[in-house]
Amino acid sequence: MLEQGESVPAVTLTDADGVDFALDVYQGKPLVVYFYPKADTPGCTNQAKDFTALADDFAAAGVPIVGISKDKPAKLKKFADKYGLRVILASDESGAACEAFGTWVEKSLYGRKYMGIERATFLIGADGAILRVWPKVKVKGHAAEVLEAVQGL
């Protein structure tokens, strides 16, 4: 997994409307990027809703929020519309961003091993360097913790 001080890799993602973009479009301002396993599942829904509840505070700090999963753009669009989400949802169908950030990892459930996205959040500085990493995120209270870090910039 990428660590504090490392540069954000050049990756192309697709937003919920099917438009391709690169994270470097946000260069020049801080950015929060969070990786989550799957849209419209309980933990991922709560996480997106928590960031949405604080969206005005992040916006006041001038910090966009991008949530990344391997879901198709159409699924992300339905997810955003269903819950009124106010974060940028991005599709990484190829897994290139997950690989580059180091969030595509071996997981284990009831003794069965499989590959999946580790829930993680990255606070990225205006210069494109990672300022802070939250690996293995527990959803409850996480968005508020990230906001506190953002407000401390």
Label every PLM stretch briefly.
Residues 1-153:
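Chalcogenol-based redox active-site neighborhoods
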